[in-house]
Regions:
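A short local loop/turn or secondary-structure capping micro-motif enriched for an aromatic residue
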Residues: 108-109, 179-181, 202-205
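Short, surface-exposed loop or secondary-structure junction motifs
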Residues: 1-178
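Short, gly/Ser/Thr-rich active-site loops of penicillin-recognizing serine hydrolases
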Residues: 166, 198-226
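Solvent-exposed loop/linker segments at secondary-structure transitions
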Residues: 160, 180, 192, 217
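Short acidic, gly/pro-rich beta-turn/loop elements at beta-sheet edges
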Residues: 54, 170, 194, 205-206
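Hydrophobic aliphatic residue packing
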Residues: 48-49, 195-196, 214
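Short, well-ordered beta-strand elements
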Residues: 173, 182-200
Length: 226
């Protein structure tokens, strides 16, 4: 939500009630029958975790995921706490002007609310790579990590895009919020990967170009298509 606008509750967002600015989240097809990008689906999962854990979502994620991985400069708190704002990048529009009022507030924390750094996001990537090998399972077991990286409908696993070849698979994801665009790509078996974050609308094109250059210079597998 833009700065200065009323912030809806999670239930209001799910039901599409004012002051939410999105349609209600509704089942469109039987689960598993087809794939569709769904921030609403992650919002349902956010409410589910709150209901089951009886904790605030940001605290649950800090204790269950961020802290065990070592992502000390990351949080799902929305809006960003005052004491952390001095270290946050200013978001910019595509025309080079700052986003009015600063960063938006995203009560849809699971889908859009993570504040992080490239280094912390790289720790997330490395944890997946190491967890898959059984070297570090701070959050997921080897079997759960393998399940996370299996494709279902389309080319998505559980939260990540899966690409590459059977010999050298990789996982990737982009991220776009108002004034922030980012990309990550990492190979499951070789330990290679990169995270590029930008603070401008349209920055994902730059992030993807930087990752392609890294892939080419360092000779990643499938570097022509990464």
């Amino acid at each position: 939500m833009p700065a200065g606008t009323p912030i809806p509750t999670l239930v209001q967002i799910l039901n599409g009630e004012q002051p939410a600015n999105t349609a209600p989240v509704r089942l469109e097809a039987p689960p598993g029958s087809r794939w569709k990008h769904s921030g609403g689906g992650y919002t349902v999962m956010q409410q589910l975790l709150i209901d089951v854990s009886h904790e605030q979502f940001a605290k649950f994620m800090r204790d269950a995921v961020l802290a065990p991985i070592g992502m000390a400069r990351s949080t799902y708190e929305q809006p960003l706490p005052v004491e952390l704002r001095a270290g946050a990048a200013t978001p910019y529009n595509a025309d080079g002007t700052p986003v009015a009022g600063g960063p938006h507030t995203y009560p849809e924390m699971a889908a859009a609310g993570l504040w992080t750094t490239p280094t912390d996001l790289a720790r997330y990537v490395i944890e997946i790579q190491r967890s898959l090998r059984g070297d570090a399972n701070h959050v997921l077991s080897v079997e759960m990590t393998k399940q996370m990286l299996l494709t279902g409908q389309g080319n998505y696993g559980l939260g990540l895009v899966i690409g590459g070849s059977p010999e050298n698979p990789y996982f990737s994801h982009g991220g776009i919020n108002a004034g922030f665009e980012n990309s990550l790509v990492a190979y499951q078996r070789t330990g290679q990967g990169a995270v590029v974050m930008t603070n401008t609308q349209g920055g994902q094109q730059l992030a993807d170009a930087v990752i392609r250059s890294i892939a080419s210079v360092y000779g990643w597998p499938n570097s022509s298509s990464s």
